């Protein structure tokens, strides 16, 4: 029985170590506050204009989500944060060029928020077991701050998280995940 367990353990270890880690996508995070006398309704109306111009002019594949903190702490002293994604730094740069271009001037000048902090990150997108159609316009997202253990890499973290996701999917739990690191770590 020990030999069977050892063979099983070796095969499992080989699978974990041989799993390929995909290239990360690029993301920008902007923490924003509503301008005086502006509301979330104003922002949502503005986002329709943003979507129209992006749909007509974007060639970078940029997409964005807006998130609202559920709890307030000194670290979340903002009304919302904008998370924009592109598949590469080049395409994130193209999206930024588009934002500062003439097509976006009217939308840019009418934005009802002021962004007070920003950072760029890389994200490894893990396999989810649901489709966008399964989601409503509002759904919970949890962020967890983690430190790598000594001798471990972001690839190790990806493989570990990927294996945890597979276990939860087999148990019928619908979820998805991203491993996020500030650009200076990658």
PLM regions and their residue ranges:
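Sec-dependent N-terminal signal peptides
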Residues: 3-13
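Short S/T/G/P-rich N-terminal loop/turn motif that feeds into the first structured element of a domain
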Residues: 18-185
């Amino acid at each position: 029985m020990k030999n069977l367990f050892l063979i099983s353990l070796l095969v499992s270890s080989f699978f974990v170590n041989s799993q390929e880690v995909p290239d990360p996508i690029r993301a920008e995070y902007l923490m924003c506050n509503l301008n005086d006398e502006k509301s979330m309704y104003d922002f949502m109306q503005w986002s329709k204009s943003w979507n129209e111009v992006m749909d007509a002019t974007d060639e970078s594949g940029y997409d964005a989500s807006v998130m609202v903190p559920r709890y307030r702490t000194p670290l979340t002293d903002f009304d919302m944060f904008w998370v924009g994604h592109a598949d590469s730094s080049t395409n994130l740069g193209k999206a930024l060029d588009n934002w500062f271009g003439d097509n976006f001037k009217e939308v840019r000048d009418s934005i009802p928020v002021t962004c007070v902090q920003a950072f760029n990150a890389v994200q490894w997108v893990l396999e989810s077991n649901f489709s966008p159609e399964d989601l409503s316009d509002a759904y919970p997202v949890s962020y967890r701050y983690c430190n790598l253990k000594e001798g471990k890499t972001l690839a190790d973290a990806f493989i570990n998280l990927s294996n945890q996701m597979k276990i939860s999917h087999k148990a019928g739990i619908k979820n998805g995940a991203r491993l996020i690191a500030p650009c200076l770590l990658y």
